[in-house]
Regions:
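GHKL-family ATPase ATP-binding module
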Residues: 2-23, 33, 55-57, 65-67, ...
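Mature N-terminal segment immediately following signal peptide/propeptide cleavage
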Residues: 25-38
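Conserved short strand/loop->alpha-helix "switch" segment adjacent to the catalytic nucleotide/phosphoryl-transfer site
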Residues: 38-57
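A short glycine-centered beta->alpha linker in the GHKL/HATPase_c
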Residues: 93-98
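Short adenine-binding "F-helix/F-box" segment of the Bergerat
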Residues: 99-100, 107
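C-terminal interaction appendages of subunits in large macromolecular complexes
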Residues: 399-418, 433-438, 449, 453-455, ...
Length: 654
């Protein structure tokens, strides 16, 4: 289905703010609502906990559209005791007059007809976010009940729905001051549709904080009213995406104090870019279209990369920071340690693929490239000290990349010469079918024997870690390729890393990290996850990385064996079987288990417990901050993180 948007003509303010006229005639109806309850995944992605939270985002995005249009500056989100949600804004209020085509109130149309809203047709909004613009009607269809209250032109209107159907028609219930305007939506997700019904404050906090960063001067309050969970957060950032970059760089050493900021309008597209280099060796670039994350990038990202690479190479040549005989800096060299936010506002964005996560609008590349090239060139000329610091870091990155390439090529040549090229310490499995195969990354020599003996040699491989795993958060690419433990993992997995990564070459569909259930084991697990997250993130995204869960206790009574994986489970088992005559042992390490115990608790797919490591693109910013906190140089943020999160840890061995 194609949706024709009216062509923009006018000044920049009108482009962003749209029309003050926001009545029933600005609401356009495009199709019905029948399919939503039958196939909810098509509209909100899934019926998991992610889909549950997506309902909140849909309503919030409608309020953000009002903020982008210049009519709203405060949004409040409340989680109530029964896990229902209220979203209140101080925008213009959804129109309540009769929509001519439907012959019913615009409020009813917005909540009962799919693809009905001011974002279609152009007069209500010039730019808007939201998933396919489905918004309010989909939330209504997937809710047990939904009540909406509109404050508009001195009057208060209400309307109620259940599972998408009207239960109480629109009614004016009183008056309010002319200043008290806006929309309040209160809904309870339908428990028969969603796998989970409990909202996570932390999940909502991350998304709402991001929204506030992207919408300068918008205030968002998140309130949890549930008993025992009462808390409140407020997000309000006058610095917008510049503050966002500073927030993401927290815990890292910035190479220069000011966040570089480029802003402008070109090709009817509004562009904002904020960036700052830090002393790390990884790049973190986040792209947004109309405040919606585009994790797969697209034309706006391409435009930025082109501008960045050309501008810095031109500057380095003109200022003799690069010799005539030296090669140009690559984009990767310049982006090493870069944190960047790219935000574009487009009236009619075009996306590629099914997921709508990659921008395809060709004009966005031209707009971003032009604005960044011009304004970044000016910034470098005005700030030669900053320009020199970035160029020097980029030149070091170029040299390290060349050294890493030599090390990588040497590894490949060795692999070709010795035939298979797998690490000598790897006890491989005989099956060549990756879907059946799994590899255990085992800490230390003591557990190696039982792991080798207890595994299924047909489908289970074992790779021991004997030396120290490198903390890649603090290491350049050449050091990573020089580390024997990491080299062993790269070779065993088969995928390569970084720009060479190829998921189709993965040799094992389960990569299982097996360490002691103590602080040292947790540290080694974190080092390995840091490496995989930074250089093979697709392994985590596709669900190939797992943490084994060896037991903490073994309990024997009346010739029966029980295993406890936490102190709570240990207490529960003792309570059930009675402590009299019970023989209890605590495993201090994997090496204390015999082959049968390790096989039963950790190796055998029928009896073991595994934790799959999950991540999504929505989590990326929060994950970057967490890994920086845990694996970075600064001690104080790490101590604060541990103190704040210790209560969530079940096996803390201090």
């Amino acid at each position: 289905m194609s949706i024709e948007m009216e062509e923009f003509e006018g000044n920049e303010a009108e482009f962003l703010h749209g029309s003050k006229e926001y009545g029933a005639d600005q609401i356009q109806i495009l199709e019905g609502l029948e399919a939503v309850r039958k196939r909810p995944g098509m509209y909100i992605g899934s019926t998991s906990v992610r889909g549950l939270h997506h309902l909140v985002y849909e309503i919030v995005d409608n309020s953000v559209d009002e903020a982008l249009a210049g009519f709203c500056n405060t949004i409040t989100v409340k989680i109530h005791q029964d896990n229902s949600i209220t979203v209140r804004d101080n925008g213009r209020g959804i129109p309540v007059d009769i929509q001519k085509k439907a012959g019913k109130s615009a409020l009813e149309v917005v909540f009962t007809v799919l693809h009905a809203g001011g974002k279609f047709g152009g007069a209500g909004y010039k730019v808007s976010g939201g998933l396919h613009g489905v918004g309010a009607s989909v939330v209504n269809a997937l809710s047990e009940w939904l009540d909406v209250k509109v404050y508009k032109e001195g009057k208060i209107y209400t309307m109620s729905f259940a599972k998408g159907k009207v239960t109480k028609p629109i009614e004016c219930i009183g008056t309010c001051s002319e200043e008290e305007q806006g929309t309040e939506v209160h809904f309870l997700p339908d428990a028969s549709i969603f796998e989970e019904s409990v909202y996570e404050f932390e999940t909502l906090k991350i998304r709402l904080r991001e929204t506030a960063f992207l919408t300068k001067n918008l205030k968002i309050r998140l309130v949890d009213e549930r008993e025992g969970m009462e808390q409140e957060k407020e997000f309000h950032y006058e610095g917008g995406i510049q503050e966002f970059v500073s927030f993401l760089n927290k815990g890292k050493e910035a190479l220069y104090s000011d966040v570089i900021y480029c802003e402008g309008e070109k090709e009817k597209i509004l562009v904002e870019v904020a960036m700052q280099h830090n002393d790390s060796y990884t790049e973190n670039i986040y792209t947004f279209v109309n405040n919606i994350n585009t994790p797969e990038g697209g034309t706006h990202l391409t435009g930025f990369k082109n501008a960045l690479t050309k501008t810095f190479n031109d500057y380095a040549r003109q200022n003799k920071l690069l010799k005539d005989s030296e090669a140009n800096l690559s984009g990767e060299d310049i982006r090493e340690g870069l944190t960047c936010i790219i935000s574009v506002k487009i009236e009619d964005p075009q996306f590629e693929g099914q997921t709508k996560q990659k921008l395809g609008t060709s004009e966005a590349q031209v707009a971003v490239q032009g604005i960044v090239s011009e304004q970044l060139t000016y910034f470098l000329e005005q700030n030669p000290a900053v320009a020199k610091v970035i160029c020097e870091k980029s030149i070091l990155a170029q040299r390290a990349r060349a050294a890493a390439r030599k090390a990588r090529d040497l590894t490949r040549r060795k692999s070709a010469l010795d035939g298979v090229g797998l690490p000598g310490k790897l006890a491989d499995c005989s099956s060549k079918d990756p879907e059946r195969c799994e590899i255990f990354i085992v800490e230390g020599d003591s557990a190696l024997g039982p792991a080798k003996e207890g595994r299924n040699p047909e489908t289970q491989a074992v790779l021991p870690l004997r030396g120290k795993v490198l903390n890649v958060q603090k290491a350049r690419l050449d050091r990573i390729y020089a580390n024997e433990e990491i080299k062993g993992m790269i070779t065993a997995f088969g995928t390569g890393i970084h720009e060479d990564f190829d998921l189709s070459k993965l040799r094992y569909h389960k990569i299982i990290i097996l360490t002691d259930a103590d602080v040292d084991g947790a540290h080694i697990s974190t080092l390995m996850l840091t490496f995989i997250y930074n250089f093979m993130p697709e392994l985590i995204r596709k669900g190939h990385v797992y943490l084994a869960q060896p037991p903490l206790f073994t309990i024997q009574k009346n010739k029966k064996h029980y295993y406890a994986y936490s102190d709570e489970e240990y207490q529960r088992i003792l309570k059930e079987i009675g402590s009299d005559g019970a023989d209890v042992s605590r495993f201090k390490g994997l090496g204390e288990m015999n082959t049968e115990e390790l096989q039963e608790t950790t190796l055998d797919p029928e009896t073991r417990t595994l934790l799959r490591v999950n991540m999504s693109d929505e989590d990326k910013a929060e994950l970057d901050i967490t890994f920086t906190t845990l694996m970075g140089d600064q001690v104080e943020p790490r101590r604060e993180f541990i103190e704040q999160n210790a209560r969530y840890v079940t096996n803390l061995d201090i």
